[in-house]
From Swiss-Prot:
Transcription factor that mediates regulation of both acid- and alkaline-expressed genes in response to ambient pH. At alkaline ambient pH, activates transcription of alkaline-expressed genes (including RIM101 itself) and represses transcription of acid-expressed genes, thereby regulating the synthesis and secretion of alkaline protease XPR2 and acidic protease AXP1 depending on ambient pH. Specifically recognizes and binds the consensus sequence 5'-GCCARG-3'. Required for mating and sporulation. This is pH-response transcription factor pacC/RIM101. A motif (YPX[LI] motif 1) lies at residues 471-474. The lineage of its organism: Eukaryota, Fungi, Dikarya, Ascomycota, Saccharomycotina. Pfam families: zf-C2H2. Activated by C-terminal proteolytic cleavage by signaling protease (probably palB/RIM13) at neutral to alkaline ambient pH. A motif (YPX[LI] motif 2) lies at residues 579-582. GO terms for biological process: positive regulation of transcription by RNA polymerase II. Residues 1-68, 84-142, 353-391, 555-585 are annotated as: Disordered. InterPro entries: pacC/RIM101 (IPR050806), Znf_C2H2_sf (IPR036236), Znf_C2H2_type (IPR013087). The keyword Cell cycle does not apply.
Length: 585
């Protein structure tokens, strides 16, 4: 026996009564034969409908079995009930008001439904947009209308440029026309800005306009800041490619640096003193190298520019700071890395113009004590007039003594590297104690002898004293320094803390290969950098000599002007007095 599916829609009450009456009439018209041949139909199931009233109401198993356990004569009754049910469902579907195809075609704005063939990939039935309806998304390709969603505007435009111009002119406005609006009302956005440029830049987010194109690729962007961020990605890619290309060279340079650090930690000279004059850092400038030593390879040759390499004012400020540190005793007259760095910075100021300034230095005034350098070379810019820090009479003497000691120390270091070196005649200065101090109100104590400046002992083991023709003779006495045997032993001294434990002794004898390697590196360093050391220290000695000349001229100028001022005061006092004065001869 074939089974029929249950229909989803419910039946009207009248149709259900008709279906219940039809089986009863048919059962009455059946011929009565033998009692055994008559079908036995349950009265309880005859009064019930054969199908549930709604698809959600389930049928019980007893009802289903009762409906199925019928005789052959009741098949016609079931078929007639099913056909009647189909007819009633078709009539009910027409009564619910389904739209005919003709009606859908006559109404342009009516909603039409797609068949199973027209469903999209997600399984959802979408409503197709008619040809005459505008694009309400506010964005689209060329040829489609763009709707303005700024509040209740609703105007349509054929291109994104026209829509953007409409938003800027009609809705944003301008301050000069008194209609400036800094709140974005596009589809309830609500963004508030403080400038018109900000709101016009924000509107580009809503408008499908991308006028800013990338020169490196085919991408376009709505705002210039978006394009700027995108261009940085190209720059980062190029930098990564460059780093990948330069990686082997960088590894080679790193190996050289490690090799230099390995042998620089050991003493280079026999005395154990390592000179820092070619290892200091210069934060502002780079010391120009002598062309004859440019082929060594340790320092690159600086480029030749037609203008001044660095700012003169900044370097003169460095000179003034150096004098101020000397006054405040912040530095010591020892040729260290800090002093070498300061002198190299000052040398950039006087190194190019040193010859002109040494020939005719400009005097300084008493009030400002300004040092005006001589006219520079034709290719150099003349530095402006600068001022030295204010000096007292005692400060001049102390500063000059400091520079004298520093120059003697530098000269001793040069002699330790190059014993044949002699100071040039143009850089010789008299002893600082031979200067005339016109306003020295603090006389020297009676019987006190001039004390020569103390100079650090030279690093060369064979030189015990430094004697220059124009510098004071400085002797180094062995009796003043306690002689310790450990100073002359070729044994490395290592400091061990109290809490440290000595290493265990091993039976393996140490090899001398490391010592030979270190000694070879030391010889290479001496051979390569000896000439550079001497040249650098000579420049620093010239800088110290120049600073002493500037200081001496400033003191003499101030003394002369002070004498003139005192004479003028005496003359004015004699003129203003009512009684004659008698001066003692």
């Amino acid at each position: 026996m074939a089974s029929y599916p249950y229909l989803a829609q419910s039946q009207p009450p009248q149709q259900q009564q008709q279906q219940q009456q039809q089986p009863q009439q048919q059962s009455q018209q059946l011929p009565t034969t033998a009692p055994s041949a008559a079908p036995q139909v349950n009265n309880t199931t005859a009064n019930k409908p054969l199908y549930p009233a709604s698809p959600n109401s389930p049928i019980s198993p007893s009802d289903y079995s009762a409906n199925m356990n019928v005789g052959g004569d009741s098949v016609d009754m079931l078929l007639s009930s099913v056909s009647a049910h189909h007819r009633s469902s078709d009539a009910g579907q027409s009564d619910m008001g389904s739209i005919s195809p003709s009606t859908a075609h006559t109404t342009p704005d009516a909603t039409t439904y797609k068949t199973s063939d027209e469903e999209d990939a997600t399984g959802k039935i979408t409503t197709p947009r008619s040809e005459g309806s505008p694009n309400t998304n506010g964005s689209g390709s060329d040829g489609e209308n763009l709707v303005c969603k700024w509040g209740p505007c609703g105007k349509t435009f054929g291109s994104a440029e026209k829509l953007y111009a409409h938003l800027c002119d009609a809705h944003v406005g301008r301050k000069c026309t008194h209609n400036l609006s800094l709140v974005c009302n596009w589809d309830n956005c609500g963004i508030v800005t403080v400038k018109r440029d900000h709101i016009t830049s924000h509107i580009r987010v809503h408008v499908p306009l991308k006028p800013y194109k990338c020169d490196f690729c085919t991408k376009s962007f709505k705002r210039p800041q978006d394009l700027k961020k995108h261009v940085k990605t190209h720059a980062d890619d190029n930098e990564q490619a460059h780093n990948a290309y330069a990686k082997p060279h960088m590894q080679h340079t790193h190996q050289q640096q490690q090799q230099q650090q390995r042998y620089m930690q050991y003493p280079t000279y026999a005395s154990g003193y390592e000179y820092p004059y070619y290892r200091y850092s210069q934060p502002q400038v780079q010391v120009p190298m002598v062309p004859s030593y440019a082929a060594v390879g340790h320092m690159p040759t600086p480029p030749m520019h037609p203008h001044a390499p660095i700012d003169r004012k900044r370097q003169w400020d460095t000179t003034s700071d150096f004098f101020d540190d000397i006054k405040r005793a912040r530095v010591t007259p020892n040729y260290s890395s800090d002093i070498a760095s300061r002198l190299s910075t000052i040398e950039q100021y006087i190194g190019i113009q040193g010859q002109q300034q040494q020939a005719s230095p400009t005097p300084q005034t008493a009030t400002t004590t300004s040092a005006t350098p001589a006219p520079a070379a034709p290719h150099q810019a003349t530095p402006p007039q600068q001022q030295l820090p204010s000096f007292k009479q005692g400060d001049y003497q102390e500063t000059d003594q400091f520079l004298n000691q520093l120059g003697s120390n530098i000269y001793g270091n040069i002699k330790s590297v190059d014993p044949q070196y002699e100071a040039p005649a143009e850089f010789h200065l008299p002893h600082p104690m031979g200067y005339r101090y016109a306003f020295s109100h603090a006389p020297a104590p009676h019987g006190a002898a001039p004390v020569a400046p103390q100079v650090a002992p030279p690093a060369h083991p064979g030189v015990h004293g430094v004697s220059a023709p124009h510098y004071p003779d400085l002797s180094y006495s062995r009796s003043t320094v306690p002689q310790l045997s450990s100073r002359f032993e070729d044994v490395r001294q290592m400091s061990v803390g109290v809490t440290q434990r000595a290493a265990r002794t091993t039976n393996v004898e140490e090899s001398d290969d490391d010592d030979e390697l270190v000694e070879g590196f030391g010889k290479m360093a001496i051979a390569d950098s000896k000439a550079m050391q001497v040249a650098q220290m000579k420049k620093h000695l010239e800088v110290v000599s120049y600073l002493r000349r500037v200081l001496q001229e400033a003191r003499e100028t101030e003394s002369g002007e002070a004498e003139d001022t005192a004479a003028n005061k005496d003359t004015s006092a004699s003129k203003s007095s009512l009684y004659p004065t008698i001066k003692a001869c």
